């Protein structure tokens, strides 16, 4: 073999051996040590709720079967939504994969009594307030105010779509109905149901005396008035076509149970409001009396007055006024002074027995009147004993207008008897009048929601609920008097109220809750309480760590950073590179285990003030997660032992024990605490578990056993079903201490992750620092992937990577029957494909669209080049775009290219040799000259074939004009031919051989030619240096007529000597080799 050729073949073999050795080292990973009993990995997805105002994720306090719910391919999470204006959206994500689902109305309000088409009414409640609990027969009207609690008062778009409310009043077997429609800014309406007077009749004989109550005037009415009870219920129904609610119904009807059955199937059942009492007050005049002195008295209406109203006050002579001890009343002067706001219009006599003269004087601040009263008869005034009051005169006063809601007006009275001294000023009488703008019979405070969850204890942010106070007039008019009321909280340790009385709130300084936290509102002489339910978090908080004992991990070295948190959260590439250089200077240390943390609590309250009975929101079986609420107030007692990576992750720093606590945002008091231990013991990674996740599916359903909570279940699909579909790996680490942790718990800067495909015809891998993606190429299944976890590049001590763990990954790629993407039939990673090792790709495209081998559309037709990589045609007919290559792939492809180039050079040399062999022939017999002929020289001691005379040319021959081949003109043959001659002679007889130049130095007649006889023959040349050993003579040895000619072809025409047998055998061997 030629030296040049042997060197190139050796380089090619060296490249091939390197590739095979590298592939062998990558196909046999070290088996991890058999793990012990490890906790099962759980799909590490993250849930997030949006478009909500108040919602919590939950956890069962005593889970029954957690293993059946959560696993490596499934995870369930319960949650509850308290306040929202629109349908919430639940998002679940895993790395770059995410999916969302809108929470359906049926899950949010499974049993809502207030159903509005195409409107969300979560936490909406219809509240009812009885205006008057005791209804007199003089005003036989039952009044109930309805309003919608839990609705945002700024939501005006729904006020025109609210339903009607029907009030049902039952008295024994009789029923009265009346309806109103909810509306207005507060979504309120007042139902007034007129009750039959027969319902105020005598009571049943069985009425107990204990049922009697005292009337407001202090009198005790008969038991008959107190025993009449009327039960009140309500239902909701849609308005009619005109938007009305129908007319009221009065008369006999079925009882409550029968009435519920009488409603249409779409109506809600009867909901109880309460009961009212009916009574008949004793007949009495609604007047009040005031004694001016022992002789005179006045009477005026017993009711509030209205602006502009004329008030008539009558002056009477009281009974028993003409006694001996009393001064004479036959003639007296009455002086009246009305304060500002009251005008005295005039006076007139009510009886002809009295003569009345008056003088009126109106001033800027008050008006006065002097009235002279005298007995008009000639007879003296008889004693007035045992008789009723005697009317004397009438005084008319007018109430002036004012801006406030109510005012107090005063009228002063002074009497001067003729002939007697006046009464002292202390005995002067004063009458006080109440003048109001409206005749309000009741006030009702309304809160936007009836419950308040005190999260301010955890966050320090105030939670407030707006409040409105409305007044109800006797006529049924509803007014907003929120700006005119006063308020006070009964216990600020539970709930507080603003100074302007427009909202109630909790600030975080409260210590307990209550089912009936009370705030009292006052309007003029009226007052009414507002009762709220206040929920407070149960303390101490429950802090849950996935691992309370953290250890160092053997072999896992990470860079030493000044602030691990800032390094993890940094996203700037320049900052990341700078930190990497700094960490290289600081060195590396062993990685500590990480632990996830969650904070839970229960919101509870007391059943009523003064009792210790505890009521838990959602029941005692649920814990509410408040990790996000307290994330800003988490503290590690000793920052040298551990630190917070983020709001959900703890990491160890050095051995020790430290408390982890949640502090109050207002008082720095500890709300919850747990101990964290960082041990000196080291643990090792026993197993790297990997699961392919091709897609995520999210499903929502009601939580079993609770109508308020919703269970979200996320399932991971491990099978890739589409061409070019991407999947990621869910990776978990198992430690020797029996704990497991997701790899995503650690920063991607602290490790290296290499995912490789063992058969790239089935799947390829797109390397990513945190989430390598698997791309489906063709159908297949098995352990087709391998995941390798290494330490950070900056902590590698040698060029050989430190592998922490490696694991095979099972992958299944199966395209559905309806899938039109091409599939790939392959015999396996270690077997050649059909057709002499070339793989076969079958496309699913239409006939005539397949791309033949060696042809690429738009690039012309190439020759039959052996394939180096198989590409699957895309169903759209477009060319597949190349993916980015990693450093490992670039190196492997470079070695493969060198190997292929060496093979190509070898093939070219072979082709050139064959072509030249087939086209070269010896010259025909008698040819005088041959261009490009090779001269074979045989040097030996055998006898010459011819005598000296025969070898010498005759005189005058053409030797002088025709170049003699014996001289071997090297100028005509070329250097390459000379080189071939030298190599062939060296191999033919073992001698060093001679060149043509050496032969010309010794003429044919030289005496030295007798010592060594030279034999010449001529063959067809092969002008290839490297393949000289494959030379084949142009002549056929078997042909007797074309034997080898020795000497020059121009002089050998006369004699055809027979070649020696050894040369004949040698040339046959050369031909056989070719």
From Swiss-Prot:
Glycans are attached at residues 70, 91, 320, 401. The chain crosses the membrane at residues 895-915. The keyword Oxidoreductase does not apply. Residues 26-894 are extracellular. It holds the Pfam family Ig_TMEM132_6th. Residues 205-224, 243-266, 564-587, 816-867, 962-1064 are annotated as: Disordered. Residues 1-23 form the signal peptide. Residues 247-262, 843-854, 973-985, 1016-1026 have a biased composition (Low complexity). InterPro entries: Ig_TMEM132_2nd, Ig_TMEM132_5th, Ig_TMEM132_6th, TMEM132, TMEM132_3rd, TMEM132_C, TMEM132_M, TMEM132_N. GO terms for cellular component: cell body; membrane. It is found in: Membrane. Belongs to the TMEM132 family. Required for normal inner ear hair cell function and hearing. This is Transmembrane protein 132E. It comes from Mus musculus.
């Amino acid at each position: 073999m030629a030296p040049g050729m042997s060197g190139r073949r050796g380089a090619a073999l060296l490249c091939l051996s390197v590739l095979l050795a590298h592939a062998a080292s990558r196909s046999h990973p070290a088996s991890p040590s058999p793990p012990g009993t490890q906790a099962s990995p759980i799909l590490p997805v993250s849930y997030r709720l949006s478009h909500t105002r108040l919602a919590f994720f939950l956890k069962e306090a005593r889970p029954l079967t957690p293993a059946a719910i959560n696993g490596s391919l499934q995870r369930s999470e319960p949650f509850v939504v308290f306040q929202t204006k629109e349908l919430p959206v639940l998002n679940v994500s895993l790395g770059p994969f995410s999916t969302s689902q809108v929470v359906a109305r049926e899950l949010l309000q499974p049993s809502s009594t207030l159903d509005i088409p195409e409107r969300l009414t979560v936490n909406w409640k219809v509240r009812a307030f009885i205006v008057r609990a005791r209804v007199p027969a003089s005003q036989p009207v039952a009044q109930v105010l309805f309003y919608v609690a839990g609705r945002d008062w700024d939501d005006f778009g729904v006020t025109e779509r609210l339903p009607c409310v029907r009030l049902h009043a039952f008295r024994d077997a009789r029923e009265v109905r009346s309806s109103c429609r909810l509306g207005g800014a507060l979504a309120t309406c007042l139902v007034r149901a007129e009750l039959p007077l027969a319902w105020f009749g005598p009571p049943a004989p069985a009425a107990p005396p204990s049922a009697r109550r005292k009337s407001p005037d202090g009198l005790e009415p008969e038991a008959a008035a107190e025993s009449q009870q009327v039960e009140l219920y309500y239902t909701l129904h849609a308005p009619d076509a005109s938007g009305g609610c129908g007319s009221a119904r009065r008369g006999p009807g079925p009882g409550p149970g029968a009435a519920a059955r009488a409603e249409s199937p779409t109506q809600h059942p009867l909901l109880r409001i309460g009961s009212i009492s009916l009574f008949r007050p004793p007949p009495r005049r609604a007047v009040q009396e005031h004694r001016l002195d022992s002789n005179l008295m006045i009477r005026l209406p017993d009711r509030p007055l209205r602006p502009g109203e004329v008030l008539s006050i009558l002056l009477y002579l009281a009974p028993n006024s003409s006694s001996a001890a009393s001064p004479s009343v036959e003639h007296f002067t009455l002086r009246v002074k009305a304060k500002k706001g009251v005008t005295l219009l005039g006076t007139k006599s009510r009886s002809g027995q009295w003569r009345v003269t008056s003088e009126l004087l109106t001033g800027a601040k008050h008006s006065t009147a002097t009235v002279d009263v005298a007995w008009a008869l000639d007879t003296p005034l008889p004693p007035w004993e045992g008789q009723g009051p005697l009317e004397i005169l009438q005084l008319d006063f007018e109430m002036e207008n004012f801006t406030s809601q109510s005012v107090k007006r005063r009228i002063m009275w002074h009497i001067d008897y003729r002939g007697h001294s006046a009464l002292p000023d202390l005995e002067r009488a004063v009458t006080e009048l109440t003048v109001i703008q409206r005749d309000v019979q009741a006030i009702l405070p309304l809160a936007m929601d009836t419950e308040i969850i005190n999260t301010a204890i955890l966050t320090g942010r105030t939670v407030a609920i707006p409040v409105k106070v409305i007044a109800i007039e006797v006529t049924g008019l509803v007014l907003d008097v929120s700006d005119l009321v006063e308020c006070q909280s009964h216990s600020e340790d539970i709930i507080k109220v603003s100074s302007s009385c427009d909202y109630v709130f909790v600030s975080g300084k409260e210590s307990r809750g209550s089912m009936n936290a009370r705030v009292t509102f006052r309007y003029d002489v009226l007052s009414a309480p507002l009762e709220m339910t206040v929920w407070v978090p149960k303390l101490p908080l429950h802090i849950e760590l996935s691992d309370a004992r953290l250890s160092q991990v053997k072999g896992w070295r990470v860079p030493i950073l000044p602030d691990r948190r800032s390094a993890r959260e940094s996203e700037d590439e320049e900052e990341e590179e700078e930190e990497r250089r700094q960490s290289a200077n600081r060195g590396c240390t062993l990685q500590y285990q990480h632990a996830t943390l969650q904070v839970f609590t229960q919101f509870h309250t007391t059943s009523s003030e003064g009792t210790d009975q505890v009521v838990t929101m959602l029941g005692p079986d649920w814990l509410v997660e408040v990790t996000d609420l307290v994330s800003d107030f988490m503290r590690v007692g000793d920052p040298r032992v551990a630190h917070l990576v983020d709001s959900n992750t703890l990491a160890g720093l050095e051995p020790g024990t430290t408390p982890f606590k949640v502090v109050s945002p207002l008082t720095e008091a500890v709300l919850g605490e747990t101990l964290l231990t960082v041990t000196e013991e080291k643990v090792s990674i026993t197993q790297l578990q990997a699961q392919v996740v091709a897609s995520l599916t999210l499903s929502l359903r009601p939580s079993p056993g609770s109508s308020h909570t919703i269970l979200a279940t996320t399932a991971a699909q491990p099978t890739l079903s589409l061409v070019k579909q991407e999947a990621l790996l869910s990776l978990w680490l198992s430690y020797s201490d029996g704990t497991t942790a997701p790899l995503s718990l650690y920063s991607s800067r602290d490790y290296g992750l290499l995912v490789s495909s063992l058969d790239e015809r089935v799947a390829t891998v797109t390397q990513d620092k945190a989430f390598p993606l698997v791309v489906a190429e063709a159908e297949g299944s098995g352990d087709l992937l391998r995941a390798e976890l290494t330490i950070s590049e900056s902590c590698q001590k040698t060029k050989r990577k430190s592998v922490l763990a490696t694991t095979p990954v099972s992958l299944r790629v199966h395209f559905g029957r309806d899938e039109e993407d091409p599939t790939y039939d392959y015999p396996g990673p270690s077997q050649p494909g059909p057709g002499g090792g070339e793989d076969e790709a079958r496309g699913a495209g239409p006939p005539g669209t397949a791309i033949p081998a060696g042809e690429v559309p738009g690039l012309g037709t190439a020759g039959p080049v052996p394939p180096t990589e198989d590409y699957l045609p895309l169903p759209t007919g477009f060319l597949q775009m190349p993916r980015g290559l990693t450093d490992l792939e670039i190196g492997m492809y470079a070695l493969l290219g060198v190997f292929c180039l060496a093979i190509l050079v070898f093939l070219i040399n072979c082709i050139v040799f064959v072509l030249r062999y087939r086209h070269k022939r010896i010259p025909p017999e008698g040819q005088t000259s041959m261009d490009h002929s090779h001269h074979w020289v045989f040097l030996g001691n055998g006898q010459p074939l011819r005598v000296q005379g025969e070898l010498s040319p005759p005189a005058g021959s053409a030797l002088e004009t025709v170049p003699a081949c014996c001289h071997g003109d090297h100028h005509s043959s070329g250097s390459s031919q000379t080189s071939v001659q030298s190599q062939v002679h060296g191999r033919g007889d073992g001698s060093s051989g001679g060149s043509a130049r050496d032969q010309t130095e010794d003429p044919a007649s030289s005496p030295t030619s007798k010592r060594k006889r030279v034999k010449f023959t001529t063959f067809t040349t092969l002008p290839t240096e490297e393949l000289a050993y494959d030379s084949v003579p142009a002549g056929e040895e078997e042909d007797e007529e074309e034997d080898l000619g020795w000497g020059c072809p121009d002089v050998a025409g006369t004699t055809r000597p027979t070649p020696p047998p050894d040369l004949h055998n040698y040339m046959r061997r050369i031909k056989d080799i070719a």
